[in-house]
Every structure is written in structure tokens, then in C-alpha cells.
């Protein structure tokens, strides 16, 4: 390939990506789609610029307008989450977690968090952010039948182990975690409580999930691009008392420049969430429950039927124990992709953490299809597409044609100030 051909190659591949997504059912629980206004903001001159430090206290010149943008982000974040302090500079949820780990612990301290098979994010584990800080990770007691932390056993373990930091939240997250149950024990042993809300930040913002800052958490960290429908990035909400400490551990601790164009997009997404977040989050959870019920009725072993399956955006399926399914979770994930149904295989609590290539489960999320206008009726259709492949054993390429026709009807962004085409390719030249 000639160097001069690279721009055209990238444009062609990008257009293919847009069209593929237009014709696909998108069920990855850690993704979402932004509004056109957010995209426009992310494509501004801010992408070329650099800023270190806080608004009004920059180490670089030329920041007067990004100061306005970031100040607005901070104020809207505080309003949305009813927080005393917000830092919007983390470039991801993992970076937000790392900043809190550095602010509140020292090497050798104990961190209490979910194990990865029980739903903990990899950044909670010794191989990632927790290990970078040199923390000793102890795991929350977990009840796989309830798909949640065992609150009584957790309190006992806090009193016995005396962790420095107690972390809630995770990647497999169908139900609120027992934050309030941990508060008294945490106070007794001198532990701080932090909540990784990366997956459920949009549901918290929409007032449809738990409110960790009111339940005893001093920190709420999160990604701004999962159930929260902004550009990729991270945020930390905390108290006034923690403000200087966390700000200094974000910069210069773990962030230098903080992707200024994404802050412009984030400001718009925050405004959208303040305006539309409650209705959006309600529908996300309604859709998750409807999808879970429809799959369960079609022979999938959807976990926690006795609890109405889920209280979040996530639907968890144990493929290995679904009697009518002869494929593995890994095989099915690939087959669904061939049919333009995009989802992921996932470890479940009874899986070996080292067997992530061949886990028992599949994880689904309803946040993106909700933003594209789908409701409960469409969840029935999605479940039927999934059944045709997993149980009826139809060829993925045959199902794909029906999926494409279905998905193309849902390409308009909802819950935004500009209900435009979510998959239109925007050209600059």
C-alpha cells in the first residue's frame, strides 16, 4: 500500500464499520452510542490541544476555552450525581480506579473486591491496577445463587481482615451491591469505601440503581461510555474533604493531558443525561428484564429467574447448563457475530479465572439498543434470533439476513437533543 492510500483505506474501513453496526444488534454490555452533538464536540480543535492541571491553574497557555468546557463538566457532574466534588480528567474507568487506589492506599495494604469470576473488573485484580499499586487483594464472599455479595459474610470478613479500602462494583453486575451493609464495619476498622460504577453509571445518573454516595461510599468512579452514553473517559465523584487529595493523584499522579475533546463531548452527554437520563435508565432496565424473560422462555438458562433476572442493563446466561444448547459459550459468541448479533462470552462464578477463553457464560447489555429506540417488543424479536442459532441450529448466515433488516429500523439516536442517524459517516474532506 502506498502511504498516500492510507487515508482512503481508513475511510473505507470506517465506512464498513458504520454499515456493519447499522445492520447489527449490539448487545455488548460495556458499549454505547453517542449523540451527533457529542460527536461534533469530539471532532473540534480541542483534540489538538494540551492542558495540565485544573481549570484556572494550568501549566500551559492557550487553555481559556477548555477551562470553560471543563468547568462546565465539573459542575454538571456534581449536579447529576449530587456530589460535593468531581474530577473529570481520568482517561478511562481504570485510570479513575488507579487514582483512588493511589490516593487511599499504600503498597501492602488490603483491598477487598470481587474476584474476576464473581464479576470483578480486571483492574480490581493483582494483574492490573490493584497490583500496580502493590495491594493485597482479598475477595468479597459471593453467593452465586443470588449473583451478589453475601452481605453477612462480607461484614464478618471486613472485621477479620481489616482492609484499607473496600471496593464495590464490577463487570458482571446484575444487582446493586450491599454498600450500606458494609458502612458500620468499615468505620470500625478504619476502611474507606469506593464504588466502581463503570457499568452502571448511567443507571445511577438516571436514578434507577443504588446511590452509592448516599449509602456510605466516599468515592464513585466510573466510565463515561457504557450505560453512561458519553465519549470514552472516566470520572471520579467524592467529598470536599477528599478533593485536593484525589485531584493531586489524578494529576500529576496518573494523568497528564486528559483528552480535551472528550471533555467537550462529555459536557453535552452530561446535559443529555440530566434531561433524559431517568426515562432512558428506566427503559434500559425494562428491556433487560424483557430480554431475560424472553430468552428464559425459549430455553436459555438465564440466571436469577427467582429475582426477575436483573436490576441493571445486564442479562447473564449460563450456556453450559442450558440443556437445549449443544454449543459452548465461545462457539456461540462467534456464531452470533456471524449473524450480526454482537455480544461477549463471560466468566461465571464457578469458572476457573485462567479459562477466560472458554467460559460458561454469555453477558448481554440493553443500553445501546435502548438508546436506538428499542423497547420490550423488540427484546422478544432479539430473543427469537438468538434461539434460532443456539437451539434451532439455523445457519448464522441465514439468520443474519433477517437481523440486518431488523437492525436497520433502529439507527436513530434517542434520549438526546438531536435525534439523528447514529451510523451516518461524517466526512471532513
UniProtKB/Swiss-Prot annotation:
The modification N6-(pyridoxal phosphate)lysine is found at residue 226. The lineage of its organism: Archaea, Methanobacteriati, Methanobacteriota, Methanomada group, Methanococci. Catalyzes the reversible interconversion of serine and glycine with tetrahydromethanopterin (H4MPT) serving as the one-carbon carrier. The use of tetrahydrofolate (THF or H4PteGlu) as the pteridine substrate is 450-fold less efficient than that of H4MPT. Also exhibits a pteridine-independent aldolase activity toward beta-hydroxyamino acids, producing glycine and aldehydes, via a retro-aldol mechanism. Thus, is able to catalyze the cleavage of L-allo-threonine and L-threo-beta-phenylserine. This is Serine hydroxymethyltransferase. It catalyses: 5,10-methylenetetrahydromethanopterin + glycine + H2O = 5,6,7,8-tetrahydromethanopterin + L-serine; L-allo-threonine = acetaldehyde + glycine. Optimum temperature is 70-80 degrees Celsius for the retro-aldol cleavage of L-allo-threonine. Its EC number is 2.1.2.-, 4.1.2.49. Homodimer. PROSITE patterns: SHMT (PS00096). It comes from the Archaea. Keywords: Amino-acid biosynthesis, Cytoplasm, Lyase, One-carbon metabolism, Pyridoxal phosphate, Transferase.
Amino acid at each position: 500500500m502506498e502511504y498516500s492510500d492510507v487515508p482512503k483505506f481508513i475511510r473505507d474501513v470506517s465506512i464498513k464499520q458504520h454499515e456493519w453496526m447499522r445492520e447489527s444488534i449490539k448487545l455488548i454490555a460495556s458499549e454505547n452510542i453517542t449523540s451527533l452533538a457529542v460527536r461534533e464536540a469530539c471532532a473540534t480543535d480541542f483534540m489538538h490541544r494540551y492542558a495540565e492541571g485544573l481549570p484556572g491553574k494550568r501549566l500551559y497557555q492557550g487553555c481559556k476555552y477548555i477551562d470553560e468546557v471543563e468547568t462546565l463538566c465539573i459542575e454538571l457532574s456534581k449536579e447529576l450525581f449530587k456530589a460535593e466534588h468531581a474530577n473529570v480528567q481520568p482517561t478511562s474507568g481504570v485510570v479513575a480506579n488507579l487514582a483512588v487506589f493511589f490516593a487511599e492506599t499504600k503498597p501492602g495494604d488490603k483491598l477487598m473486591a470481587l474476584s474476576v469470576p464473581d464479576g470483578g473488573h480486571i483492574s480490581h485484580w493483582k494483574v492490573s491496577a490493584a497490583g500496580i499499586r502493590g495491594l493485597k487483594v482479598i475477595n468479597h464472599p459471593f453467593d452465586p445463587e443470588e449473583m451478589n455479595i453475601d452481605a453477612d459474610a462480607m461484614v464478618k470478613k471486613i472485621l477479620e481482615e481489616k482492609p484499607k479500602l473496600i471496593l464495590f462494583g464490577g463487570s458482571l453486575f446484575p444487582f446493586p451491591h450491599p454498600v450500606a451493609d458494609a458502612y458500620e464495619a468499615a468505620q470500625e476498622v478504619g476502611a474507606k469505601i469506593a464504588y466502581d460504577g463503570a457499568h452502571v453509571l448511567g443507571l445511577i445518573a438516571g436514578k434507577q440503581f443504588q446511590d452509592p454516595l448516599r449509602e456510605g461510599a466516599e468515592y464513585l468512579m466510573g466510565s463515561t461510555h457504557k450505560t453512561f452514553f458519553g465519549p470514552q473517559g472516566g470520572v471520579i465523584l467524592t467529598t470536599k474533604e477528599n478533593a485536593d487529595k484525589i485531584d493531586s493523584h489524578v494529576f500529576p499522579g496518573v494523568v497528564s493531558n486528559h483528552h480535551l475533546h472528550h471533555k467537550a463531548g462529555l459536557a453535552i452527554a452530561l446535559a443529555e443525561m440530566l434531561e433524559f437520563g431517568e426515562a432512558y435508565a428506566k427503559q434500559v432496565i425494562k428491556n433487560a428484564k424483557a430480554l431475560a424473560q424472553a430468552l428464559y422462555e425459549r430455553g436459555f438458562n438465564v440466571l436469577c429467574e427467582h429475582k426477575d433476572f436483573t436490576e441493571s442493563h445486564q442479562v447473564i446466561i449460563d450456556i453450559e447448563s442450558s440443556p437445549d444448547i449443544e454449543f459452548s459459550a465461545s462457539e456461540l459468541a462467534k456464531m452470533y457475530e456471524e449473524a450480526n448479533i454482537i455480544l461477549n462470552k463471560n466468566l461465571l462464578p464457578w469458572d476457573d479465572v485462567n479459562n477466560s477463553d472458554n467460559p460458561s457464560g454469555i453477558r448481554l447489555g440493553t443500553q445501546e439498543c435502548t438508546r436506538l429506540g428499542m423497547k420490550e417488543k423488540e427484546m422478544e424479536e432479539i430473543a427469537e434470533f438468538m434461539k434460532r442459532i443456539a437451539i434451532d441450529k439455523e445457519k448464522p448466515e441465514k439468520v443474519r439476513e433477517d437481523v440486518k433488516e431488523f437492525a436497520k429500523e433502529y439507527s436513530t439516536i434517542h434520549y438526546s437533543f438531536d435525534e439523528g442517524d447514529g451510523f451516518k459517516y461524517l466526512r471532513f474532506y
